[in-house]
Amino acid sequence: MVETSDEWIRERTGIGERHVSVGETVVTLASEAARKALEQAGKRAEEIDLILVATCSPEQYLPCCACRVQADIGAVNALAFDVNAACSGFLFALNTADAYLRMGLAENALIIGSEVLSKLVDWTDRSSCILFGDGAGAVVVERCKAESRAVEYGNALAETEEKRIPAAGILGRALHSDGTGGGVLQCGARELTTPYARTSAAKTDQNQPANDREHYIQMDGQEVYRFATRRVPQCIEEALSDAGLAVADIDMFVLHQANARIIDAVAKRLHADREKFPTNLERVGNLSSASIPVLLDELHRQGKLHRGDRIVLAGFGAGLTIGACVMTW
């Protein structure tokens, strides 16, 4: 199908295996993840009043995936809509839900990242088809009265300087978009026509794909690498500054699982211990918006996340988009 080898893929990406859905869709995967998250959180579907589905691979235009998930799981009281920020989607959705909770517009939110990217890759294109997998992950977040605790900084200043931060939840964030880089990573939709259109509209936007593979994911891998290794550390440092914390204060960095080399480079640029950057891409590949929640679930089930841990979530994707948030588990 494509000229490559297991050794070539592992050496350049760190990916050893991925999963391709057969019969499942973005919605069925999202609904399954949602049910498991609700069970783990001890919540009934009727208690959820906000559902956000982050995806860039929906199987239909209308209705949105979130509304279909709402119907599937019986969350009759939930406002539901989708968020498309590609691989940054889960972070953008999580911060959107956080805003709803802080404003008192919701009490319990369900955030899902779900992708079936196997249908969007050209299986003869070695630069993209080796990367992406299918899957979904979900989290439940709830509004609560923020407890506070003292956090000491430094050594000599520990007795005189302290900062009050919430005992749980998001402490700081940084979210950015750069539409000028849209052509770096893109996937065109099927052309839509009307009976009144005499000819197909010419593509004049340089950010729009214009070749025979326009309906598949197209990526400038080198440019994506340069963007990620430069901007992800900057975004993390910005979020840490917003939280009043430093790299050394963080127990774990949960990054979008795109490429092992990118994660290595981010850790190096932050001067952080590589052991604090867990990965699962060797088993699942790049799950786009699902990568962070799937990894969080694995870490939680493995007992590697503990109440009170300070963690950083960070991701980047098409748009170009990038985001990071600091939170207490």
Which role does the model predict for each range below?
Residues 27, 31-34, 38, 57-58, ...:
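Claisen-condensing/thiolase-fold acyl-transfer catalytic domains that form or cleave C-C bonds
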Residues 54, 84, 109-115, 141, ...:
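Short beta-strand segments
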Residues 62-64, 121-125, 322-326:
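Short acidic, glycine/serine/threonine-rich loops at helix termini
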Residues 46-54, 248-256:
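Short glycine-rich phosphate-binding loop at a beta-alpha junction
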Residues 2-8, 60-74, 111-117, 198-209, ...:
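Acidic-glycine-rich active-site phosphate/pyrophosphate-binding loop
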Residues 1-23, 125-230, 234, 316, ...:
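Condensing-enzyme catalytic core mediating Claisen C-C bond formation in acyl metabolism
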